[in-house]
Amino acid sequence: MAQPSFIENFSQQFTLEPERTALLVIDMQNATGNRTMGLGKLLAEQGNSASAEYRFDRIENLLIPNIQKLIAGFRQAGSHVIWITYGANAADASDAPHHIAPIIKATNNIAGQPEHEVVDALKPGPGDL
């Protein structure tokens, strides 16, 4: 007798209700997701561009295309798309948690700066939150 698979044992069937469902797109910002800004620029200045290639290749060739598909599907179904960004409002990042303030400052992830914006390939659309 065949054993049930692990996935079958721990999966439940469910139905998404578009009017009660939302897609959260979190931290897809230039500060950490753009190879020429923020972290990408910082790594290049430190001479570590090669070590960042894997990260940015995955973001550009896997993560962003899949998020684009999810966004299209959620919008088509009439669901909300909610954009969540993080960073600081204060230029010195004094309003950020102390453990992430240094990377926020180093990547210029400050509200109003281009690094704080969502990457161009995933700009929020009309009706998004």
Spans of features found by a protein language model:
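Active-site acidic carboxylates
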Residues: M1-P126
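Glycine-rich oxoanion-binding loops at beta->alpha junctions
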Residues: L129
